[in-house]
Curated annotation (Swiss-Prot):
Membrane topology category: Multi-pass membrane protein
Keywords for this protein: ATP-binding, Cell inner membrane, Cell membrane, Membrane, Nucleotide-binding, Translocase, Transmembrane, Transmembrane helix, Transport
Gene Ontology CC: plasma membrane
Recorded superkingdom: Bacteria
Protein name, per record: Probable export ATP-binding/permease protein PFL_2149
Annotated TM spans: 251-271, 277-297, 525-545, 586-606, 615-635
Organism (species): Pseudomonas fluorescens (strain ATCC BAA-477 / NRRL B-23932 / Pf-5)
Molecular-function GO terms, alphabetical: ATP binding; ATP hydrolysis activity; transmembrane transporter activity
CDD domains: ABC_MJ0796_LolCDE_FtsE
Locations listed in the record: Cell inner membrane
The protein's assembly and partners: Probably part of a tripartite efflux system, which is composed of an inner membrane transporter, a periplasmic membrane fusion protein, and an outer membrane component.
InterPro entries linked to this entry: AAA+_ATPase (IPR003593), ABC3_permease_C (IPR003838), ABC_transporter-like_ATP-bd (IPR003439), ABC_transporter-like_CS (IPR017871), MacB-like_ATP-bd (IPR017911), MacB_PCD (IPR025857), Macrolide_Exporter_MacB (IPR050250), P-loop_NTPase (IPR027417)
Binding site for ATP: 42-49
Length: 652
């Protein structure tokens, strides 16, 4: 006689209730050959269901040995037991145990998903099984749209999906009417005829009468094991055969499982829209806060830096004396036009301009104003990046011939001429020198500039020779070439000036240091605000964990069903972890979209500057979403994977 397919020796199963321990099974010895149709009967509480659970590797024995096709199960871990359930057993439950949010076809496919069967083959087999059971027109129907008999046929198809070498049917007709029950028993007999080993657990003698062999269990012991010969025409006409579909290779199977985890996660999330929305709300708020704050900070930084650049962030100013406030500075008259010429020869220097200035009286008609009169070179407007609103600036030729021309600023234009008079070509008195207005600068909206100051500019030669009567310079302004390091250029300027003067009787002022300070400050502020926003992300993550823990509790029976059809602990853990990550990623995407919407509204109401979104902040936001999903989804996923399949299936 061949080795039994299922062989139990001395199997006992005890349970603890408080301080008491009781035996549900007592020293069970049982062998079941491949291809048998066996009925296990007994009253409620007799131990028959516990025996079925041990046979199906859903439960474990406290003592004894249980072999499946010669393989000892006693020392197998949870993963190996899951593989045994997946490869050998198909379960048919009294209450069908179909997942309500999946269609009939997807319910049937579930065991093959965990077996790693390719999608095309999986779909084909599910259709074939459902068609064989008369459900070809109900592939897309959910359990709530099917009758009890139809649901049980879906359950049978699911049991056969991976071959179902052993069919374990727990009260398969218990929830059905007589006609549907008879139909299900006919299907089980057909499966037996095809070579499947069919084990029926029932308390109904009429159902048990369909089996070849009837085993009666009472008080945890087998009290009867008798043959029940059927008419010859009903006996199996073929030897047992394996109809298990070939699985995919390991790598392909793993990738397929990961893909299916995403599909199943999406179905689960869509099936509970309100819960999903509330779960991701905290993530949406957190991501929106982080991305928006970073964008506002970057926009503010660029706005400030732009204003600094407008007053000369890439310029170096040279002044007489040791530093600002030096009492000896007025007596030092060593800055000369020749220094400007020498500085213009340096490779690092884009342009340099002399500067002299005094507060003098301006007069036009009967209007007198005090303004700062600046004597500069024709390069001054390039050095300071000052744009003209109208007219032109003076030329090098104007400087050589000490032309009596002047460029005025926007404030001076308004004060002297008003809005209705074109100042170009008008003659004004600068001190006692009549000068023709040839240009007007744009209005200065720089946040670092005093908005009410009046400035006019003359060629340096004109100002020094005809207005101020001095040859030395008050200061020199040097514009650095683009791309050149400011500190390096500053050192070369200092070295050249010391060589020319023979001593260090000057000091330099470089606005680049101010720019760096602003950048550091803005980074610190953005970091501070981001940390505050991250707190909301953490709160959102805790919300995800709480809802996922609730979800695990609500879906305990689903977890038990998945384990019964072959899901390993790692599959369950991956399923819930993927759900948590998906919630956070969707929340992150919504949060980023909201940030862009806020940025658009921001530009409508605030014209001076705008929010600046960077790819780095968006990638960081998605990375944070993923990390939060993994970190805060791990505990619920771990709890789900650790559930006992028997307890999970028993949960309502």
């Amino acid at each position: 006689m061949s080795e039994p397919l299922l062989h139990l020796t001395g199997i006992s199963r005890s349970f603890t209730a408080g301080d008491r321990e009781f035996l549900a099974l007592k020293h069970i010895d049982l062998s079941i050959q491949a291809g048998e149709m066996v009925a296990i009967t007994g009253a409620s509480g007799s131990g028959k269901s516990t025996l079925m659970n041990i046979l199906g590797c859903l439960d474990y024995a406290t003592a004894g040995s249980y072999k499946v096709n010669g393989r000892e199960t006693r020392d197998l871990d949870d993963q190996a037991l899951a593989e045994l359930r997946r490869d050998y057993f198909g379960f048919i439950f009294q209450r069908y145990h179909l997942l309500p949010h999946l269609s009939a076809m997807h319910n049937v496919e579930m065991p093959a998903i965990y077996a790693g069967t390719p999608q095309v083959r999986r779909h084909g087999r599910a259709r074939e099984l459902l068609a064989r059971l008369g459900l070809s027109g109900h592939l897309g129907h959910r359990p709530s749209q099917l009758s009890g008999g139809q649901q049980q046929r879906v359950s049978i198809a699911r049991a056969l999906m991976n071959g179902g070498e052993v069919i374990l049917a727990d009260e398969p007709t218990g929830a059905l009417d007589t006609a549907s029950g008879k139909e299900v028993m006919n299907i089980l007999q057909e499966l037996h005829g095809l070579g499947h080993t069919v084990i029926i657990v029932t308390h109904d003698p009429k159902v048990a009468a369909n089996a070849q062999r009837i085993i009666e269990v009472r008080d945890g012991e087998i009290v009867s094991d008798r043959a029940n010969p059927r008419p010859a025409d009903e006996a199996p006409s073929e030897p047992p055969v394996s109809v298990r579909p070939a699985g995919a290779r390991r790598l392909v199977a793993s990738l397929g499982l990961f893909k299916e985890a995403f599909v199943m996660a999406w179905v689960a999330l869509v099936s509970h829209r309100m819960r999903t929305l509330l779960t991701m709300l905290g993530i949406v708020i957190g991501i929106t806060s982080v991305v928006s704050i970073v964008a506002i900070g970057e926009g503010a930084k660029r706005y400030v830096l732009k204003d600094i650049q407008a007053i000369g962030s890439n310029t170096i100013d040279i002044f007489p004396g040791a530093s600002f406030g030096d009492s000896r500075a007025a007596a030092i008259q060593t800055l000369m036009p020749a220094d400007v010429t020498a500085l213009n020869q340096l490779y690092y220097v884009d342009s340099a301009t002399p500067m002299v200035g005094r507060s003098l009286l301006l007069r036009y008609g009967n209007i007198d104003l005090n303004a700062t009169v600046n004597g500069v070179s024709h390069l001054y407007f390039q050095v300071r990046d000052i744009k003209l609103a109208s007219g032109i600036s003076f030329s090098e030729n104007d400087a050589r011939r000490q032309a009596q021309v002047v460029v005025i600023d926007h404030n001076t234009r308004n004060r002297l001429f008003g809005p209705d008079v074109d100042p170009l070509g008008q003659v004004i008195l600068v001190g006692n020198l009549p000068c023709t207005v040839i240009g007007v600068t744009r209005e200065n909206k720089n946040m670092f500039a005093a908005s009410n100051l009046l400035n006019v500019w003359l060629p340096y030669e004109t100002a020094a020779g005809r207005v101020l009567g001095q040859r030395h310079l008050d200061s020199i302004s040097v514009r650095i070439k683009d791309g050149q390091p400011s500190k390096v250029v500053e050192e070369h300027v200092k070295k050249l000036m010391e060589q020319r003067h023979g001593t260090k009787d000057f000091f330099t002022n470089n606005l680049d240091s101010i720019m760096q300070t602003v950048q550091r400050t803005s980074r610190s502020l953005a970091l501070l605000l981001s940390l505050i926003a991250v707190i909301s992300l953490v709160v959102g993550g805790i919300g995800v964990m709480n809802i996922m823990l609730v979800s695990v509790t609500e879906r305990t029976r689903e977890i038990g069903i998945r384990m019964a059809v072959g899901a390993r602990q790692s599959d369950i853990r991956q399923q819930f972890l993927v759900e948590a990550v998906m919630v956070c990623l969707i929340g992150g995407a919504i949060g980023i979209s909201l940030s862009f919407a806020i940025g658009y509204l921001f530009t409508l109401f605030i014209k001076e500057w705008e929010m600046v979104f960077s790819m780095g902040s968006i990638i960081t936001a998605f990375a944070c979403s993923t990390l939060i999903g993994i970190v805060f989804g791990f505990v619920p996923a771990r709890n789900a994977a650790r559930l006992d399949p028997i307890e999970a299936l028993a949960r309502d």
